[in-house]
Each structure stands twice: as C-alpha cells, then as structure tokens.
C-alpha cells in the first residue's frame, strides 16, 4: 500500500503551487475572503512545516483555528491528489514568524490527536526547510584542551549559535570534536566554507573538519554497516547506495546472498553474478559468519559441483557471453581440471537434461554458459539434490522463523524493513502494517526467515537497536493459535 511521505508531498506541491500565494504579503491559502488576509511580512528564516495525521474531511478553513493560535499564518495548504483531487491527510504550513512555527511544533507534535485519527498529529519541519540536521555541524580535529566557550567563540562570527557541545569520554576528557547548531542553514553553510580545512589545531593530527552532522537515517545506516562488518556478512544492499531500488533487484540480490551461504560455511558456487548496474567490481568477500543455510542455485539453475574456497582465487567470474551488460571481475575462474581433482566427484547424469526453456525468465536470451562451464559442467544432477523454494512467494516461514518487530520508524516501509534484516539470512516475506483509514504505518511489522538460526541471529543483533529516539523490539512471533502475535 502506497504511503505519502514528506518528500513526495513536497514534490507534488512544487508541481502544483497554490494559486493564491503572493511573494511577500502574508495571505491565507485557501477559500478565505480577502478581508481575512493579513498584510504582515514573512521572516526570511521562516520555517515550512509538514503536518501529518489530519482527518481527510478537514480543509484549510477548518485547520486555521487550530494553528493560528500560535501566530500569523503565511500559508496553509492541504495536499490533494493531483489526478483525483482527494484529500491526502497532510498539509504544509508556514507561519510569518519563525518563533510561531517552533511554538506550534512544540505544542502539537505527537501531543494532540485530531477527531477520527488513531495517531497524534505530526508537526515538524518539511524536508525542504532548515531541519536540525541542516543547521547542526560536526566539528572534528579540535584541540582536546578547547572548551565549549572557545568553540563557540570560533563560530559565533557566522551567526546565532543555538547549541554547542564538546564530546567527552567517561572521564570528562575531550574527544577532540564537537557539535555546533546554528539558527539557520545559511549560517551553518558559511561556517563550513570558511573554517573547513582552514587550520590545524594544537595537538590535532590533521586540519580542522567542519561538516553537516549526519541525520538519524545516515547514523542508522552507518551503524548497520558496522554491525554487518562485525558479523562478517557482505550485503550489497547495505554497503552501497541503492535507492531507488526495484523489487526485482531486491529479490535478485536477496537470492544471490543466499547462494553465498552454505550448510558448512566453507563452500560457494562460482556461478554467482551481480547486476553490473549496481556493483561494478567486487573484491574479496569475507564469508565468516554467514548464516547457515542450504546452497540455493540462482534463479532456478541446477548447481554444478561446489568448490572449496581454498581452490577459488576469485569469488565470481563474468558471464560475458550470456550477460553482455556485466562488467568483468578482476579474478579468473580456476580450470575445471583443478576443480575435479580436489576430491570432488562430478554428479552422475540421472535426471533430465537442463534446457534453456526451463531457466528463470530473467535469464531469457542466454545462449551459452561456456564462459564458466563447458558442456560437461552442465551435467544434470541427481534427484536427491534439494530444490530451492520459490523466492518471496511464501507468506510465512516455518515455526521459529517468524519475527515480530515493534517501534519501527513511521517512514519505514516494506523495502526498508527487508533491507534492515537482509544481512541475517534469506527473507521469505516482510510486511509493515498500515492503518487503512490514514494510510500511515502502525510502526510494527513482521519478517519471516527460512530457518530458525537466521531468526535468532536477527533477534540478538536487532532487539534494542536504536533508530532515532526509538529502540526496536524484536522477538519471535507467537504461534497462530494465540490471539496476539506478541
């Protein structure tokens, strides 16, 4: 189910700007008579607010009394579908004064629930405005003797400073870095341009670092990357910027991650190939700590004999003949003679021969596979070879493989939930539950793995994992005979 985000709402508003907005006067957007329009001026640093969780039967004139108690309103626009004209349950609000916006956010954000709504109203700066992350600077390579007052004096020439804090260890000693928050984005940008790399502080190993502080999402992604690295898991969806990502690419990446995992943790299939549009080169990939699972041939292909990692100098080889879009990898595949002499006996031909027509539709047009295996390498396998289950078709995993996740961020959807738990194993399904009336996330969901060990690894790593101001609650979903899943 589609959800409206602040960024999408802002994009639609830019495509269809309000008809009655005037550049500097302070009118009310909407069907208000001219007598009620104000002649006040908008502050240069006025904040544009995003307002969510609004009943769909309320228009601008109905919302005005709620917001004008905090100050004069410059613009109030309810977002509507560009094609159907239907109310989307959110709006943009701009006050004439910056202080009015701050007061409204403090008094209303998640503090008041409007009639007919299940969740409290959301009032926060829109993405296009000066959010806290756009005004907050990270300052590194400071002298460990510098105090908050000295850091403040260094930056106060560029504007009004709202906060300044030096990061300190448990013993109270400075870590040589600080956070400085200005009152506007322009002031913070000016400080970056003037001070970044401008000097080397006493005792610092390199020049001064001044940059915008990371947002909550960036910090969360970085922590997840670090956690994945500690577990020894390689997950391209976390290691590379993948947005926007198609559903097919996610499913393919998930399947290829499963191919890399085996029941013994020491074998891999050389037939793995990653989409060149997302990964240009892959060096060595550490397989230590990969979740244990039976090897799954990619996209329905029967796997040739598995190969010990000691005999494989390169992880993968290019399918240049069958996949013209793939970029060759730096390592070459070992000769088949070498493979077959490593105490590995070829599969006997007891099953029907593999034909091109039986391949996955994604591999339509593949004419030959001699880039990796000659004809002998495609010898059919025995009937005892386990066949992989269909990817992303089963709604729930076996007993002990289904997780309940609570305290999810409001903006998280099915894709974000999948990417968060993909490092721990093969995901059968993932779902964030939505409110049918408001089309907003209920902030909880479910993830189903194909084996219990992956589920337990995910619980140990992600239960209590902090995202923003919330800590995830991750536990096994109760059996179906219980009335509640948690």
UniProtKB/Swiss-Prot annotation:
Its GO biological process terms? Answer: mRNA processing
Annotated CDD domains: RRM1_CELF3_4_5_6, RRM2_CELF3_4_5_6, RRM3_CELF3_4_5_6
Protein name in the entry: CUGBP Elav-like family member 5
Per the record, where are the segments of Low complexity compositional bias? 12-24
* Family listed: Belongs to the CELF/BRUNOL family.
Which species is this UniProt entry from? Xenopus tropicalis (Western clawed frog)
One GO MF term, please? Answer: RNA binding
Q: Name one Pfam family in it.
A: RRM_1
Q: Where is this region: Disordered?
A: 1-39
PROSITE patterns per UniProt:
RRM (PS50102)
């Amino acid at each position: 189910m589609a959800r409206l985000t602040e960024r999408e709402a802002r994009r639609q508003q830019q495509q269809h700007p309000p008809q009655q907005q005037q550049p500097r006067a302070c009118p009310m957007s909407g069907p208000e008579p001219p007598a009620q329009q104000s002649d006040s001026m908008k502050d240069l640093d006025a904040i544009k607010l995003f307002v969510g969780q609004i009943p769909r039967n309320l228009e601008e004139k109905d919302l005005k009394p709620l917001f004008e108690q905090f100050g004069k309103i410059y613009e109030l626009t309810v977002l509507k579908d560009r094609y159907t004209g239907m109310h989307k349950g959110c709006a943009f609000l701009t006050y004439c004064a910056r202080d009015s916006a701050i007061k409204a956010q403090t008094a209303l954000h998640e503090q008041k629930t409007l009639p007919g709504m299940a969740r409290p109203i959301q009032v926060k700066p829109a993405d296009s405005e000066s959010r806290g992350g756009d005004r907050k600077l990270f300052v590194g390579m400071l002298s460990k003797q510098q105090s908050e007052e000295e850091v403040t004096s260094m930056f106060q020439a560029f504007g009004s400073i709202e906060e300044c804090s030096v990061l300190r260890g448990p013993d109270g000693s400075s870590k040589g870095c600080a956070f400085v928050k200005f009152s506007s984005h322009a002031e913070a940008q000016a400080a970056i341009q003037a001070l970044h790399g401008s000097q080397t502080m006493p005792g610092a190993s390199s020049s001064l670092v001044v940059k915008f502080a990371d947002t909550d999402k960036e910090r969360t992604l970085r922590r997840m990357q670090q956690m994945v690295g500690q577990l020894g898991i390689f997950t391209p969806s976390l290691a590379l910027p993948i947005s926007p990502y198609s559903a097919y690419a996610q499913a393919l990446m998930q399947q290829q991650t499963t191919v890399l995992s085996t029941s013994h943790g020491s074998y891999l299939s050389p037939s793995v190939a990653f989409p060149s549009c997302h990964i240009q080169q892959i060096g060595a990939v550490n397989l230590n700590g990969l979740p244990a699972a039976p090897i799954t041939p990619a996209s329905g292909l029967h796997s040739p004999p598995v190969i010990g990692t000691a005999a494989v100098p390169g992880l993968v080889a290019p399918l240049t003949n069958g996949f013209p879009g793939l970029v060759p990898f730096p390592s070459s595949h070992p000769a088949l003679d070498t493979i077959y002499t490593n105490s590995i006996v070829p599969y006997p031909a007891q099953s029907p021969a593999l034909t091109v027509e039986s391949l996955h539709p994604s591999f339509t047009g593949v004419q030959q596979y001699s880039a990796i295996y000659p004809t002998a390498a495609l010898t059919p396998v025995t009937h005892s070879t386990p066949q992989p289950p269909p990817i992303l078709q089963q709604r729930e995993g076996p007993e002990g493989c289904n997780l309940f996740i609570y305290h999810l961020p409001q903006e998280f959807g099915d894709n974000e939930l999948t990417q968060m738990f993909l490092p721990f194993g093969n995901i059968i399904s993932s779902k964030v539950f939505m409110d049918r009336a408001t089309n907003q996330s209920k902030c909880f969901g479910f993830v189903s793995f194909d084996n219990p060990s992956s589920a337990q690894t995910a619980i140990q790593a992600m239960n209590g994992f902090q995202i923003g101001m919330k800590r995830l609650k991750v536990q096994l979903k109760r059996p179906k005979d219980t009335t509640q899943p948690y």
